[in-house]
Amino acid sequence: MKCRIDDNKKVVLGDYDIRGVIFDIDGVLLDSLGIWKDLGARYLIRQGKEPEIGLSETLFSMSMEEGTRYLKEHYLPDLSETKISEGLENMLRDFYYYEVWAKPGAEALLKACRDAGLRVTAATSSPRSHIERALYRNGLLGYIERIYTNAEVGFSKHSPEIYDRAAAGMGFEREQVCVLEDSLYALKTAAAAGYYTVGVYDENGEPDQKRLEETADIYVRELQDLLKLIQ
C-alpha cells in the first residue's frame, strides 16, 4: 500500500489519514520476547534443576502466577510461591535493565515517524519500570510521548481500551491511528476496533505468522521495511 506525506505533514496510507502511531514494545521495539520463553528454564538452572524438554512452550501460555505454581509443583516443592515469584521477577527486571537490546531499525523508524510529524505513543503488557529503563538505555524513550500499560489501564489487549486511551491522549480518532503489533490476538483487537494495523514479525513471537499477515493492513518482517513507506 502506497504512503505519502501531504502538505500538512500527514502520513497518508491508501485511504487512511494517519496522524498518530501506537507501538507495542516487546517484539516490536525491543528484542525481548525470548526472555518470556526462557525465564522459567533460566530460573531452574540457577536453582540447580534440569528443565524438562518443552518447558518453555508449557509456560509461555501461562500467567506469571500459573507459571510460578507449575515450577513449585514440578520442581521446587521446598520453595514458597512467593519466593519463586520474587526470583522470576528479579531475573526479568535484570534482563530489561541490563540486557535487552532494541530491534534493528527501531530508532530509525521512531525518528522517521517524528520527522514525518506523527504523534508516537506505546502500549505494553509489561511493567512500566522495566520498559522505561530498557527504552532509555537503548536511546528510544525520548521518541515516545507516553506509554500506556495494561496494568494501569486495567484491561488486557483482548480489549481495545489501551489503544483507545492512547488515541484519545493524542487527540485522534481510531481511523487516524496506526497500531504496530507482533501478536495476532492484539492485532485482531486493534483491527476490529477500526485502527490501521501493521503486523511485525518476531522469531520468538506469534506462531501463526500467516494469519498475522492476513489480518494486518501491512505486514513486515523487518522494521526497516516500514521506512520505505514513510521516507
Tell where the protein language model's regions lie, with residue ranges:
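Short, flexible loop segments at the rims of nucleotide/cofactor-binding pockets, characterized by
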Residues: 96-101, 125, 197-199
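Conserved phosphate-coupling serine/threonine residues in phosphotransfer and NTP-handling enzymes
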Residues: 28, 124-126
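Conserved SAM-binding loop
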Residues: 29, 120, 179-180
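Residue-level marker of regulatory loop/turn positions in helix-turn-helix DNA-binding domains and
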Residues: 102, 123, 155
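N-terminal helical cap/lid subdomain that shapes the substrate entry/recognition surface
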Residues: 2-116
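Asp-based, Mg2+/Mn2+-dependent phosphohydrolase catalytic module
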Residues: 1-19, 111-114, 127-128, 132-231
